Amino acid sequence: LGEAEFLDSVRHFRDKIENPDLKQQVKGFIGQEAHHSRQHQFVNSELDRLGYRTDKIEKDLKKEIAKLVAKQTKQFRLAYTVCSEHITAIMAEYALNEPAFLEGMDAPMKDLLLWHSVEEIEHKSVAFDVYMEVVGDVKYLNKTMKIAIIIMHLHFTQRMFKLAFNTKHWANFREFAGFMSWMFGKGGMWRSLRQPYKSFYKKGFHPWDNGGLELVEKWQREYAQPEQNKASTEYQMGHPA
């Protein structure tokens, strides 16, 4: 659902792009995000199978996106996509930099998230470059980011509460509190993202200032080999013959 809105927000400005290289990057971005949408459907079906109720979250998300489309300008929607892509990219970079983040996860799901993280990094500058070429208002973009980060924190917490208390897996509050501490507490993911998040506001900022290509190259060397993990018991359990 989120990917569909990201795509629409960029498509609205597609005809105004003059840079031929950027036009090609937008084409690739659209293809990747469409594929991500299908992968999210797969993940949601797996979560449903495990007892997590993702249908309620999807229903709420549809309403949120409908309100955004109805009430906000095309400029705001593109700016919001830029902000979302930045936050998603720094989360992806964190996942690739911190092996413990995915520790204990089943091999097929871990491989999927690593792959998804790599693709988020690969196209992390596309929406930003489109915005800068067709709009170029940095002050507006920075204001949008301040709104976006608050909304994302609120929505993330809200959705985790819904997942936690609509499934038997998180029946006790202690387990849920531990997860929230892991995400938001000292040494948690969100605190670790402070510096890369703040870099967004630096004068002359560009998404590639934070690097990231080295993580993509490392993944391609170490993980992008389908045969590599097939010998593991975890992989075989997730991919029955």
Predicted regions and their residues:
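Non-heme di-metal
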Residues: 1-241
